[in-house]
Amino acid sequence: MSGFNKNQIYWGDYVGVIAAFVGVYTELVARIFIYMIPERVREWFRVRIIVLYHYYISSKTTDGMTDAVQKCRNIYEICEAFGYRVEEHLVRTQDNFILCLHRITHPKQSQHKREVVYCHHGLMTNSELWVAVNESERSLPFVLIESGYDVWLGNNRGNKYSRKHITYKPKDEEFWNFSLDDMAMFDIPDTVDYILRETGREKLNYIGFSQGTAQAMAALSINPDLNDKVNIFIGLAPAYAPKGFSNYFVDYIVKVNPKIMYHLFGRRCLLPSVTFWQNICYPPIFVKIVDVSLKILFNWDLSNISLNQKLCGYAHLYSFSSVKSVVHWLQIIKNCTFQLYDDDMALLAGYGSRHYQVPLFPTNNIKCPMLILWGGKDTLINMEVMRTALPPHAKEVSIAHYEHLDFLWGQDVKEEVFPVVIDALKHHSLGKAKHFVKQNGFH
């Protein structure tokens, strides 16, 4: 074993690596080329592309609110467009990241003595995800506020609103040395403690979307005291041990060797160039690009989300995260287990799993009430695996025709999701959990 190289890429990976490198560097060359074109020439092409798009592809027009939300630069402008205000709060984690919390308020309503709801977004997104809608009635935070709740939106380390550390700067590699482990050990518990101190409450209600579900489950599983601070945990479209990608080529590359991502993108921020393409692309064309990408990767049809909603939502969908956090998810996908980050993943190939075992998040240890809402067409959840890892008291509701993003932006989200969420919050905060479960027949 003296010649074993921990950072080695095996010969079977080379074809995939070369193809991936070609794709990455082709994008880089295209970006540099477009950037070098004079602004006046770029604008000339942009105008003609818009004309051709509306002539040959679509002549549909958008409504005023869609245009307004799409053009908003941040969550403050989005909420203002709907008549709400945003309080900004900063949380210093135990490992010295500065996280930004957004508390959504209504100017005509008091926050005093309201039940607290803490909502957390998914991977490579931010708090805007919850409010980037063209109708206020289809934003869960807005609906919760009107239902009498004190709503807080969290942000992961490294994203648009949380790019601050006491020691490191975003240009430093050390800044991006974080994975799901760090969010579970620090971000979620420290954010919960801050909200409870600020509001004077003993408990809050937690709602997570996608990775926001996974990282809170991880946090609850390794922080026993955290369970005593949560009335109910509600997971929307949980990302939990996904089976993989729908595209065979992509699935093969990431499953053969997740560390390929480090060779492609380094150990820093992942895909910051998305913001460049988003800025130069005509929004309906950007929507088409995102739709095609999600179809290729996850086989989502996205037919339950309107074009106007996509124009609003996709404009605020992407935010920064670390390459390491994505590598962590690729490890989870490869092993089909909800595990901690594997720092020595190459050892599995060198020594075999008989002598090396990555710790799993002990999610069976979660004590607080749990409700999982998942979609029958969501390829990012493996319910067979998830059920074996949930505690016996966890309840689930399935929506057969739902894909991943439908839980945020689906056209029928007001009828399919919001009533279940609000009923769960109401009954658990009133201590009527048993009646709630029996009445709704959860399975």
From Swiss-Prot:
In the bilayer, the protein is annotated as: Single-pass type II membrane protein
Q: What class of enzyme is it?
A: hydrolase
| GO aspect biological process, one term | lipid catabolic process
Record InterPro entries: AB_hydrolase_fold, AB_hydrolase_lipase, Lipase_euk
The superkingdom listed in its UniProt entry is Eukaryota
Entry EC number(s)? 3.1.1.-
Query: Which compartments does it reside in?
Result: Cytoplasm; Vacuole; Membrane
- What is the recorded name of this protein? Probable lipase C16A3.12c
* Biological classification of the source: Eukaryota, Fungi, Dikarya, Ascomycota, Taphrinomycotina
